[in-house]
Amino acid sequence: MVSIVNIFMDYWFAEIITIGNEVLSGKTVNTNASHIGRRLTSLGFTVRRITAVMDEVDEIASAFREAIDRKPRVIVSSGGLGPTWDDKTAEGLAKALGVNLELNKTAFDMILEKYMTRKIPITEERKKMAYMPYGAIPVENNEGIAPGIYVYHNNIDILATPGVPREMENVLENFINKMLRNRSNLKYLEDFIYVENVMESSLAPYVKELVKKYDIYIKTHPKSYEMSHPILEIQIAGSGKQEEEIKVKIEKVKFELLDAIKKLNGIIRNSL
């Protein structure tokens, strides 16, 4: 797979942590990391690392601690905020930050209101979702019960979201719209070319040259076997302060790639 990272995106690093035994065992496909990655990328961040860990306090704490040590601008986690015994993200994050886990009154009021509206009593298990690291700010979850957890630590925006995809997406958007402090001033744009009958290895030299020439991100995604009717999805992406400049650069790259594909007897498709 041909991939060279655009150097001017590096300053705005982000990291993603997925928490859950079901992800590690393969029972659950990690679609949350994919969504979070694309959303952060659209904001101008470069996602440097995605980590998946077990539902264990020490594992979770270690993942957060190591991510913090790498000093990204943003860390987003998913999973482990529910009412069951194995939901341990809040405790792990508190341990990583070196602070106590405490009942967050604002979070408790959010949870209480949702259960009271449905005339459902509060149990210790339901109350558990209101425990957060000292100093944390709860993030509204309009699709479920457990609020997200937001902490600003060492100039890093840290967000913990629930594992249920629709809840994760909602909490992430609420965080972006209301709380995110580290905002890149870069614009991010991407485009795609779909081609048949060109092997990835044949196109690789052209991609390498264009990356050097235009300082842009180009990635080829094989959609079939290299030696048997090859099909490629080619991603062209760029970021910068001026949107029009990025558009022009992408169009120039597309033009030269299409010329290379023609020389290699490739067939352009509108989609896959």
UniProtKB/Swiss-Prot annotation:
Gene3D superfamilies: MoaB/Mog-like domain (3.40.980.10). Pfam families: MoCF_biosynth (PF00994). PANTHER family: NICOTINAMIDE-NUCLEOTIDE AMIDOHYDROLASE PNCC, NMN AMIDOHYDROLASE-LIKE PROTEIN YFAY. It comes from Saccharolobus solfataricus (strain ATCC 35092 / DSM 1617 / JCM 11322 / P2). HAMAP family: CinA_A (MF_00226_A). This is Protein SSO0103. The lineage of its organism: Archaea, Thermoproteota, Thermoprotei, Sulfolobales, Sulfolobaceae. CDD domains: cinA. Belongs to the CinA family.
